Structure formats: C-alpha cells, structure tokens
A protein has these predicted regions:
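Conserved beta-strand signature within the Rossmann-like core of class I S-adenosyl-L-methionine
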Residues: 172-182
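SAM/dcSAM-binding transferase cores
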Residues: 188-246
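Conserved SAM/SAH cofactor-binding pocket of Class I
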Residues: 64-156, 162
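Short loop/edge segments at beta-strand edges and connector loops
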Residues: 53, 131-133, 206
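Short alpha-helix immediately C-terminal to the canonical SAM-binding loop
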Residues: 111-113, 183, 187
Length: 246
C-alpha cells in the first residue's frame, strides 16, 4: 500500500473498526494520522524512527497497537511515556484521547525534538516533551510520584523497567508496559523489584490485533498497580540498575 491519502484513511478506519476501535477515529483524526505517517516516513532517515515503513503495517503495528491503551486509561489522566522514542505510544494516544495529559520523555534530544515538532504540527496541545533520563526524573520532586500512569514500549527488561517507571507513578496509579514475547519470563524475575518499588497487583493481558492480510500482531500488555510509595533510595543511577537489577 503506497501512501495515498484516500487509501490510507480508508485502511486506518477499516483496521480500527475490525479491532473494535472505530469510535477513536473521525475525519479530522484520520487525516492527522495520515499527516503523522507522512512526516514519520519523510524524517525516518534522519531520525531512525522506525523499521516499519509500509503504511498498512504502520497502521497495525504502531497506531492500532498504541490505541489499545486508550480504553485502559481514566478520563483526564496524566501520563508519562518513558523512553518515548519515535513518539509511541505518545502520539497515537494523544490523537485518540485528547483528554489525556501526556509527558513524552526520552534521553535523546534529537528524538524528543522530533516528537515535539510533530505534536505541534498535529495541533496536539495535550503533549509536553522533555529531555531527561527516567532515573533522573524519578528523583525530581516535580515528577516523582506525580503521574496516574507511566507507559513504556520496548524500552528495557522488566526489572529495569520497573525501577525506571514505578517511582514516577503516584500511589493508586499504574505502570503499563507494552512488552514482547519474553514478558512472562521477565515478569517472573521482577516480582522482587515490583514489591521493593511499591508495586502491587499485576495484570497480564494478551493484545491481539489484525488487519485481514498481514500476520496478526500479538503481545502481552502488563499493568502494575502502585500500592505504596517508592523508597527514597530508588531509582538508583542507571549504572547500578544495569549492573545489579533488583
């Protein structure tokens, strides 16, 4: 599928409808997803944003996948997207849920600038972008335990990810990790980290998305409830997190 505007808009509406997410799109949002795709493909060589460049696969693997989070987030929630990279899930989520307040965080200034400029181009006033390491943000009083949710997509293995994300989540909030096929194994090894960092109940949901002509997209979505405050000693410096995971 070439990036033809009419064909793209038809395809994204078809795929969202097929996966029970038709209510997330309207004419304006469909056109903004087209503009997002156009910009991402144009800037891909400069920023190394995605290995997926076929529009139909972008719709399934990036847009529909990120939109699955929309139904799980309470109205008006504050979210920090840890390691936002190319803007996933930040940009699709901000498009389908304009009530959310999303902070896109990454340690790479070049990528943060791309996400910021793209959000501005799309008129997404509910996105704020910051250059920071998650372990530094977790020690910053203006961000520590301030968010309803922390999201992460393909950032790190679970023990490391918990130490980067849970300190940013307020008590009663949730960390939501979009993980790959090793998630259950990683999760089994992260029980101690979850407990130490203030996490509680863990929920694993299998996300399965289809478009009718490519292989279905299937991966686990892990939600961890924040039950108590994270001890002040966490998060540690990244060298310690990497060398001695909890």
């Amino acid at each position: 599928m070439d990036l033809n505007k009419e064909a793209f808009i038809s395809e994204i509406n078809r795929v969202f409808k097929m996966n029970g997410m038709a209510s997330y799109l309207n004419v304006e949002k469909s056109e903004k997803f087209y503009l997002l795709t156009e910009r991402m493909l144009t800037e891909n060589e400069k920023y190394n944003l995605t290995a997926i460049t076929e529009p139909n696969k972008i719709i399934l693997n990036h847009y529909a996948d990120c939109a699955t989070l929309a139904a799980k987030l309470k109205k008006g929630a504050s979210i920090v997207d840890v390691g936002c990279g190319a803007g996933f899930p930040t940009l699709p989520l901000a498009l389908v849920r304009d009530d959310l307040k999303i902070v896109a965080m990454d340690s790479t200034a070049k990528r943060v600038n791309y996400v910021k400029e793209t959000a501005e181009m799309l008129g997404l006033t509910n996105v704020t972008c910051i250059v920071s390491r998650a372990e530094d943000a977790g020690k910053d009083a203006s961000m520590r335990e301030c968010f309803d949710y922390a999201t992460a997509r393909a950032v790190a293995e679970m023990r490391t990810l918990c130490e980067l994300c849970l300190p940013l989540v307020k008590v009663g909030g949730e960390m939501v990790a979009m993980k790959g096929k090793n998630a259950e194994f990683e999760l089994a090894g992260a029980k101690r980290a979850i407990s130490i960092l203030g996490g509680g109940d863990v929920k694993v949901e299998d996300v399965v998305l289809k478009n009718g002509h490519d292989e279905p997209l299937s991966h686990p979505l892990i939600s961890i409830k924040k039950r108590q405050k994270t001890p002040a000693t966490y998060p540690r410096a990244f060298a310690q997190i990497s060398k001695k995971p909890l």
